[in-house]
Regions:
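Active-site recognition of the HExxH zinc-binding catalytic motif
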Residues: 1-17
Length: 180
């Protein structure tokens, strides 16, 4: 999958669509300027969206995909994990019993499971958007201000394990260019 992702960059000039990973550069795309890559946009003018010919019918631009709620729940889960680790480290240093440690783990794991279930409900709510083309905020290393064409694509993560329609078309254009 990494090879295919990197192939997308090298062969078709595709941008990274992820935004939550730590990268060595910030503000890679200047605000207010439309990126050149075919698969991300600053959405300066929704009426001239660069992939408008591929938009799915009935999809709002920008496309609500539960981003804020997903991010908030994911952050809560990370916080609970961090709190659990700190608590368990503290208990171990204090010489707590295995039973006490086990009970604390059980309590934190239940909190995590509850938050994951909440997150899963949000994911399910927006599942109808899978495979659709819209303008999904969060792309090009930026959580806000840049948009990608689909909820998931090989340029965003390895979950979808395929390129979205916009990226497929960009690759197709390059194949046609090099074979003519």
């Amino acid at each position: 999958h990494v090879f295919l992702h990197e192939f997308g960059h090298a062969f078709a000039g595709l941008a990274d669509e992820y935004y939550s990973s730590q990268v060595a550069y910030s503000d890679f795309y200047p605000k207010g300027i439309e990126p050149q890559e075919p698969n991300i946009t600053a959405l300066l003018n929704p009426k001239t969206l660069k992939w408008r010919q591929y938009l799915s019918k009935g999809i709002d631009i920008p496309t609500d995909w539960g981003k804020e709620k997903r991010e908030a729940l994911s952050a809560e889960i990370r916080t609970i994990y961090k709190e659990m680790k700190q608590k368990l480290d503290s208990l171990e240093k204090a010489g707590a019993s295995k039973d006490e440690i086990s009970e604390v783990k059980k309590s934190y794991n239940q909190k995590i499971a509850d938050k994951r279930e909440e997150l899963n409900q949000v994911i399910q709510k927006y599942r109808y958007l899978e495979g659709k083309v819209g303008a999904f905020e969060g792309a090009g290393y930026s959580s806000t201000g840049l948009y990608r064409p689909s909820m998931d694509c090989l340029m965003k993560s390895n979950k979808g394990m395929k390129f979205c329609k916009v990226c497929q078309k960009a690759i197709e254009r390059m194949i046609i260019y090099y074979t003519k």
